[in-house]
């Protein structure tokens, strides 16, 4: 059994299991547990709508994923007319696809194969519904992290980001970035796109942002180089193959944090780490980072509409100690 706590609307029991195609629901931020209650000391998740209308982000923290002490974190930043559809469907289906492949392989040895196979299957599922939901110019980023034993395994598509936060030997806050922001500005990403006849150009109005365009048409102008969906550009170098990595958890590592670019566009890794370490509780850390990013948007870009902001924060060295949800 699982317990699903949708942060936008309160708690509700969920009889489904992740081993099937679990539907986490339609809320933007979901905290899910395979225990009867949600352990409040293990982490938090938050998703705040920006100033562009519908919140197209989705986020998940699944406690007890795969094993009792396991966890899955995911942030999905949708874009385009069907961005919210894509991000929530990936959030709702990819964890069960991934777990199915994890059950059939050695997780630590075959993590790259597991992720690549799972992401390809997920992308095909989105393509299959194109007659109902046209995702030719819509898609989502995905940054996914699985805590498995004393390791954190990460998969990344696009420009959402994962960081590890802890304390150094001299007591200072430390932060390590676990993913690369996969954008057309990365030389190897641009090279792949151009080899497949896609174009990488910036608009005159925003010369600092490189985008991906069709060979002979000035559309769609995608600001990332890897994504689910975005089928207009799949023949021109945009791929749904994740960049993967594995990281050993040490005694100095305290938190794993994932966030959409609505955070990273305005806050540095170090600023985010400081907010987390100063947070009064694990249960509030994600929302405090999201609020800090919102305030930074207002200060730094007062005339620009705030982006959607999603954050997942997991405590790494605490055991499950479930407390009933009131």
Curated annotation (Swiss-Prot):
Every copy of the PPM-type phosphatase domain together lies at: 42-316
Q: What is the lineage of its organism?
A: Eukaryota, Viridiplantae, Streptophyta, Embryophyta, Tracheophyta
The EC code for this enzyme is 3.1.3.16
Q: What is this protein called?
A: Probable protein phosphatase 2C 61
Which Gene3D superfamilies does the protein's record reference? PPM-type phosphatase domain
**Gene Ontology molecular function: any one:** protein serine/threonine phosphatase activity
Q: Which reaction does it catalyse?
A: O-phospho-L-seryl-[protein] + H2O = L-seryl-[protein] + phosphate; O-phospho-L-threonyl-[protein] + H2O = L-threonyl-[protein] + phosphate
Residues that hold Mn(2+) 2 according to the record = 77, 261, 307
Q: Which UniProt keywords apply?
A: Hydrolase, Magnesium, Manganese, Metal-binding, Protein phosphatase
Binding positions for Mn(2+) 1 per the UniProt entry: 77-78
* Family according to the record: Belongs to the PP2C family.
| Top-level EC class as recorded in UniProt | hydrolase
Cofactor(s) the record lists: Mg(2+); Mn(2+)
Matching CDD domains, A to Z?
PP2Cc
For this chain's record, the cofactor binding note is:
Binds 2 magnesium or manganese ions per subunit.
């Amino acid at each position: 059994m699982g317990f699903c706590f949708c942060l936008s609307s309160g708690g509700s029991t969920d009889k489904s299991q992740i081993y099937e195609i679990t539907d986490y629901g339609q809320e933007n931020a979901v905290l899910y547990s395979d225990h009867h209650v949600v352990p409040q000391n293990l982490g938090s998740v938050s998703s705040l709508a920006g100033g562009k209308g519908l919140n197209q982000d989705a986020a998940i923290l699944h406690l007890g994923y795969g094993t009792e002490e396991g966890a899955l974190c995911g942030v999905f930043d949708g874009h385009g007319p069907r961005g919210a559809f894509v991000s929530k469907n990936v959030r709702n289906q990819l964890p069960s696809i991934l777990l199915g492949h994890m059950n059939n392989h050695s997780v630590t040895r075959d993590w790259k194969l597991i992720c690549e196979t799972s992401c390809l299957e997920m992308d095909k599922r989105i393509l299959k519904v194109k007659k109902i939901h046209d995702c030719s110019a819509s898609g989502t980023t995905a940054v996914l992290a699985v805590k498995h034993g004393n390791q954190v395994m990460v998969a990344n598509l696009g420009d959402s980001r994962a960081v590890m936060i802890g304390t150094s030997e001299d007591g200072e806050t430390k932060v390590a970035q676990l993913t690369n922001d996969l954008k057309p500005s990365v030389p190897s990403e641009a090279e792949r796109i151009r080899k497949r006849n896609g174009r990488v150009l910036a608009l005159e109005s925003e010369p600092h942002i490189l985008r991906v365009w069709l060979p002979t048409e000035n559309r769609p102008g995608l600001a990332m180089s890897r994504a689910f969906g975005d089928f207009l550009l799949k023949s021109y170098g945009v791929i749904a193959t994740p960049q993967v990595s594995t990281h050993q958890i040490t005694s100095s590592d305290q938190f794993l944090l994932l966030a959409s670019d609505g955070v990273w566009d305005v806050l540095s890794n170090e600023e985010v780490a400081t907010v987390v370490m100063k947070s009064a509780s694990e249960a509030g850390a994600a929302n405090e980072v999201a609020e800090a990013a919102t305030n930074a948007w207002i200060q730094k870009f007062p005339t620009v509409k705030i982006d959607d902001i999603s954050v997942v924060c997991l405590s790494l060295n605490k055991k499950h100690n479930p407390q009933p949800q009131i």
